[in-house]
Amino acid sequence: EMTWNFACSTTETSTWADGGRKFGELMEKATGGKVKVNIYAADQLTNGNQSEGIQALMNGDPVQISMHSNLIYSAFDPRFNVVSLPFVYDSYDDADAKFDGEAGEKLKEILGEYGLHCMGIAENGFREITNSKHEIKSVDDMKNLKVRVAGSNLLMECYKRWGADATNMNWSETYTALQQNTVEGEENPLPAIDAASVQEVQPYCSMWDAIYDCLFFCINQDIYDG
């Protein structure tokens, strides 16, 4: 018998954590109870640090399986930023077609270079921007807005060029920062926004579909081979 730890950045109520739980149910059933999967949302095993959550997966301890965004993986390899170049996709169908095909296979190959087996590429979605100050109807409305962005140099550069006062922050720290007005806005796909109850402290949400990101559902290669 063995126990695997699944980690993700979002909360217990998120679709990411739901995916981990479903995987655990299927593994337990397929192995007759010999493999159990514990769920650690909000990167609990690495004190909320998303990059350290991925490093723990690469090490195979204390994380054996995880679901993290390509944007966080870009801290290890800038090639993962290609997924999130602005205004590349016409629709969700367009993005799905690319990652179900050659682009997805190439990304899996790169993950393999880091000792990871990618079991699937999931949809995180288009990253919408929320804020507590005003409606955003044009890029000019982002001028000097203090916006939390995910840990990606690409996102930092994009939002700075769009005029925002962009800052990086772990997702686990973001709700409190929004509540205390340390930052005035954040950007994320709607499921992550909803799971973290961002709408409680952010009255404005701009649906502009500028940047898309995906999720890599990975297992440590040594664990997979074992």
Enumerate the predicted regions with their spans:
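N-terminal secretory/targeting leader peptides
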Residues: 1-93, 109-226
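Signature of the catalytic double-stranded beta-helix
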Residues: 97-105
